[in-house]
Curated annotation (Swiss-Prot):
Glycans are attached at residues 122, 238, 266, 410. GO terms for molecular function: DNA binding; flavin adenine dinucleotide binding; L-amino-acid oxidase activity; L-lysine oxidase activity; L-phenylalaine oxidase activity; toxin activity. It comes from the Eukaryota. Its main location: secreted. Expressed by the venom gland. It is an enzyme of class 1 (oxidoreductase). Its EC number is 1.4.3.2. This is L-amino-acid oxidase. Exhibits unusual thermal stability. At pH 7.4, the enzyme retains full activity after incubation at 25 degrees Celsius for 30 days. Is stable at alkaline condition and is not inactivated by freezing. Pfam families: Amino_oxidase. Disulfide bonds join 28-182, 338-420.
Length: 491
């Protein structure tokens, strides 16, 4: 049993139910080594007396974090990055007078490792408001302010004991039942999809499940392992968030500034040969094929990108199966750049509106630009909701979300076209380097694959958000990098 799953079992068997049924499960999901990783982020690795030659594949935040630790400890490091920039899925679109984060856009208060690096680099933060009572629900053709807090208006067919409760309350109560009654092994909880658990164990009505899917935006992820939904739900429920003032790309750029000489951009790794105590990395640069010989290799590319590399000898069958089986979520952001911040006429400043229309979730800006422009995340979707947009042109995507905004904000489409003349569309499923937005697990995959995905193969090590928990966060990428930096440093 790996440490993560052991913690889950301890969580379900040993955490008492609070009076308000609100348990900070995020802390329970932290690995036992977390405080050590945080200390390493703060103070670095010990100085080495035996410098190693290390090649890192990928200049995303995981690769950059590991490289910084290695260099400061005295190791010789080279990073090979296939694209023409650093940061990976941390990506900020910039134009004159405004910017928008098309990748990560918030940092939870509990993510102390990423905050440690933000502090080290003296990067400023400002609050990211997750909710605003003046924002809207538009679900089942019913439009209602969030402040109304009256779910019965939406006409879900609920059991008597479910009526008058919010979607969050209904979800929380299914978790309280697990905490109170669970005597089962970890495999049972990983064996459920979220929807299956809510119906079979939570004993919720079809209407209650639909309500959770709509209001908590869980519907597109109902196929995930129930444990993934637990982690996501409580991370958002019990957290405050911040954003990086001026754009998230500042974080990888600060890493890059300190070690630009060791980062080789436009360098695609094609083959890795592991013989005895040396690893040879073959890669294609802009004009020629090259190779590097190293003592160790750390692969921080996504699982899908890793499958494009030829390994000699091949990776083990269990490792290959885990990489092949891992699911990657699609995610799409559709951004409108507006000269009139029409949402402020509704009293909305930050937060989000939620709808069952294709837009699903609309996030309002938490910062202003001196030129008065408002940059609206008019649709943020993932899983099947995101796949809806994949084959559409950017112009059609914008047309769809404008239709939704007409209904949500009671404005005309002609008005929206006149004030929101620019747009940005990011479809992570089509990104040729990440090949998806973030990893996730379907039932049984935590049990079967989580440990193997993080396991090294001889002198080849693996890091990235898919090798740790919870998936899809900068913090996860960083702590996986620290984990493997320690392992290689001590090897």
């Amino acid at each position: 049993m790996n440490d993560f799953l052991l913690l889950l079992l301890v969580l379900f068997l040993g955490v008492p139910r609070s009076e308000n049924h609100v348990i900070n499960l995020e802390e329970c999901f932290q690995e036992p080594e977390y405080e050590n990783w945080l200390a390493t982020a703060s103070h670095g690795l010990t100085k080495t007396l035996n410098p190693k030659k290390i090649v890192i594949v990928g200049a995303g935040i995981s690769g950059l974090t590991a490289a910084k630790l290695f260099r400061e400890a005295g190791h010789e490091v080279v990073i090979l990055e296939a694209s023409d920039r650093v940061g990976g899925r941390i990506k900020t679109h910039r134009e004159d007078g405004w910017y928008v984060d098309v990748g990560p856009m918030r940092v939870p208060q509990t993510h102390r490792i990423v905050r440690e690096y933000i502090k080290k680099f003296n990067i400023s933060l400002n609050p990211f408001r997750q909710t605003d009572e003046n924002a809207w629900y538009l679900i089942k053709h019913v439009r209602q302010k969030m402040s109304a807090n009256n779910p019965e208006n939406f006409g879900y067919q609920l059991n008597p004991n479910e009526r008058g409760k919010s979607a969050s309350q209904l979800f929380d109560e299914t978790l309280d039942k697990v905490t109170d009654d669970c005597t089962l092994q970890k495999e049972k909880y990983d064996s459920f999809s979220t929807k299956e658990y809510l119906i079979k164990e939570g004993k919720l009505s079809t209407g209650a499940v639909e309500m959770i899917g709509d209001f908590l935006n869980e519907e597109a992820g109902f196929h995930n392992s129930f444990l993934i939904s637990v982690m996501d739900h409580f991370l958002f429920l019990n957290n405050s968030f911040d954003e990086i003032t001026g754009g998230f790309d500042q974080l990888p750029e600060r890493f890059f500034k300190d070690m630009d000489s060791i980062v080789h951009l436009n360098s695609t790794v094609e083959k890795i040969v592991h013989i005895n105590n040396k690893v040879t990395v073959f890669y294609e640069g802009l004009s020629t094929n090259m190779r590097l010989v190293a003592d160790y290799v750390l692969i921080t590319a996504t699982a899908r990108a890793t499958r494009l590399i030829k390994f000699v000898p091949p990776l083990s069958i269990p490792k290959t199966r885990a990489l092949r089986s891992l699911i990657y979520a699609s995610a799409t952001k559709i951004i409108l750049v507006c000269t009139d911040k029409f949402w402020e006429k509704d009293g909305i400043h930050g937060g989000r509106s939620i709808t069952d229309l294709p837009s699903r979730v609309i996030y309002y800006p938490n910062h202003d630009f001196t030129n008065g422009i408002g940059v609206l995340l008019a649709s943020y979707t993932w899983y099947s909701d995101s796949e809806f947009y994949t084959t559409l042109s950017d112009e059609k995507c914008v047309d769809v979300v404008m239709d939704d905004l007409v209904e949500i904000h009671n404005v005309s489409k002609d008005y929206l076209k006149s004030v929101c003349g620019k747009h940005v569309v990011q479809k992570w499923a089509l990104d040729q380097y990440s090949m998806g937005a973030f990893s996730t697990y379907t039932p049984y995959q935590i049990t079967h694959y989580s440990q193997m995905l993080a396991q090294n193969e001889g002198r080849i090590y693996f890091a990235g958000e898919y090798t740790a928990h919870p998936h899809g966060w900068i913090e996860t990428s960083m702590k996986s990098a620290i984990r493997e930096a320690i392992n290689i440093h001590n090897a």
